Amino acid sequence: MAKTINTVTVVGAGYMGGGIAQSLALADLKVEIVDVDVEAAKKGLERLLQEAQEFEDQGLYAAGSTETIKANLTAGRTLEAAVAESDFIEEAVFESPEVKREVLGKISEHAREDAIIGTNTSTIPVHVLVSAVKHPERFLTVHFSNPAPFIPGVELVSGVATTPDVVDAVKDLLARAGREGAEVADTPGMVLNRLQYALLKEAASVVEEGIATAEDVDTVVRTTFGFRLGFFGPFAIADQAGLDVYANGFNTLSEAYGERLAPPKLLEENVAAGRHGVKNGKGWTGDFDDETKAEVIAYRNKAYARMGDLLRELGPAPKGKK
């Protein structure tokens, strides 16, 4: 396999594929976009360069970014010609197993045998798509999030045959592009959408039960626990709040809502083992000596203060009209 990725083809010049291509080109990788035909890809390139200039003018990209993208991002060849010369091909077409399998088959047919093939699916497992790919050891999900130019996290999902060197090469690519890859198991929805959809389902239940309006639910989420999530994940947040506190909270919730909000087994095991979080130095995410406790608290306070400053600077987000 290609140990270091230097050339990339993104198949699909739409919103997601275009954003991925733009992000990688900005990291000084040579990127080519292809689409249903050459003219569509050329129009996509024109749009991406215009968008990059707008981002630069708005201060969202550093000065000179558009020129960097222009120097590294190309279009004008067929899929067959483009993928034949690429170290890494990222499929970013319509979220349909049938469509993706058809496109992946074409990519696989014309790509070098050592080229790595990724799919940007957000919900479809690798094992559903892998039959379309020759040499399945080089295939994996590389799931960027929307908007790709600004969201740093990328989910990586290996199939049964995917080799570690393939994952390592993609992680290196992502690091060079200022992205952070997280490996997750091959299941529908992976982690991002499983959590995101679960939150929306519970939020909708709150509205359906008349507990709060959708607007007030959004306010609660963005101004409380959602405020923290740019800096800490759910396990780190639980460590800071106290795992024993969480366990007691789950007991109250399970009395009201039943098994779906019963305490997680892993949480109960941690509490039973005397791991209560940062406060007693033994948490879900690790152990905390006095110095580390102080560092966590200082980072948290600085992060939340800066987030507050940013929100005040930006003001409220625009809302749809009712």
Name what the model sees in each region:
Residues D37, A62, T163, A212-D216:
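Helix N-cap / loop-to-helix initiation motif
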Residues A40-Q50, D165-R176, D216-T219, T223:
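A non-catalytic, amphipathic alpha-helix used as a structural packing/dimerization or gating element
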